[in-house]
Amino acid sequence: MHAPDADPRHFPMKELEFVLMMASFQALQALAIDIMLPALGAISRDLELADPNQRQLVIGVFLICSGLGSLFPGALADRFGRRPVVLTAIAAYMLLSVLCAISGSFQLLLVARGVMGAVTSAMMVMPTTILRDRFDGDRMARTQSLIVMTFMVVPMIAPMLGQTVLLFAGWRWIFGIMGVLAGCVFGWAWLRLPETLDPRNRQAVQFKVIAGNMGTALRERSSIGYFLGAAFTQGAMFGYLNSAQQLVGEHFGAGTLFPVLFGGMALVMACTNFANSRIVERFGARRVSHAALLVYIVLGVVHLLLAFRGEDLWTFLPLMTLSMCMMAFMGSNFQAISLQPFKRIAGAAASVMSFVRVVLGAVLGSLIGQAYDGTARPILAAMVVFGVIALLLVLYSERGRLFRRINPPEYYRNNPPAVTPPAS
């Protein structure tokens, strides 16, 4: 699995291929969530679940285990490199897709989904780490927005793909499609992905070193408010994902239109990420994300008040889509800001941030999902509360001041000094 170290100044991929490859890594993990949404009802009937809300565990267990597993890929990648970790994760994804497909009980399916989430968490951590290897600050936020915009194709088409499979075959075939797609991405990465870890930044695989690097990431005030804030807003989104099929498909009566409506929301979010990639280098990641967070809170309050007065699908959907768009403006920018201080330990920092963001977000999302009462009120109330908490956390990181430009890498004590290339 060895590839020559890539000099960032002479990276072998053009930007388009790089964006597509990083998006494909993240898309595989998103596919494991979104393609399952139309199948949850079929799984519930086929495996004879007593409580209809249990079906949400197919999503919730995967997300929680993804967060728990994300502690490890970064530390391994800081020692052995990004490429071997990525390839191992994709290979495991293929094998575990087969195990999910042949599961004979709901318990075995949950175990397989949990292991799949843990092992393949690298596919969310590594793109961020590789991106941090190559870019800083607002440029990183711009490229991350392009990656997210591209990867948003998955939630646009995955539910419709899952629905199509169910028309012609059982839910188990969905996992077969996941395995085949993972095989294609594995071949592409094997042939084209170079190693981006600077040999000077290679870290030892020792508990003391790993714990020290993760502790450094957790102690950085300028970072912690952003990735904790992202965890709370992501928790609200996970809560919506967990309940989306019941809320939109059943309560609001969308029925078979649910995958189309879900995909339409994802399309709008993809456009938002493209807009972010166009404006973030001009206005700065902080200014864009701070404005989005404030609008997100206001939208949540307005939507919650409407929900108590009574709403239909065509009131709910536009307002929820606007809220998700604000999350799109926050996501890439929060990530870039929180990783800015950690060029030397990018893998460990990305891992611990992903762990906190996904585990906390998944736990909060599962609690929201289990609180589903046949209305949108639990989700909307969580969005307001979690949005306010995120704002307080950002204010802590910013020492009470919003809308500043992002600091250069050399501002932070955790980053090595810039190396000037020798004159030719």
Regions found by a protein language model. Give the residues of each.
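Extracellular/periplasmic helix-loop-helix junction of adjacent transmembrane segments
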Residues: 39-68
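Helix-breaking motifs and short loop linkers at transmembrane-helix boundaries and internal kinks
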Residues: 49, 81, 102-108, 119, ...
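Juxtamembrane intracellular "pre-TM" segments in multi-pass secondary transporters
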Residues: 2-12, 194-226
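Cytoplasmic helix-loop-helix junction between adjacent transmembrane helices
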Residues: 112-153
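Paired small-residue
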Residues: 92-99, 107-115, 314-322
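Conserved MFS/SLC helix-loop-helix module at the cytosolic interface between two early adjacent transmembrane helices
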Residues: 68-107
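Helix-loop-helix hairpin linking two adjacent transmembrane segments in secondary transporters
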Residues: 108, 138, 142-191, 197
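Residue-level signature of mid-helix packing/kink "hotspots" within the transmembrane helices
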Residues: 34, 63-71, 155-156, 266-274, ...
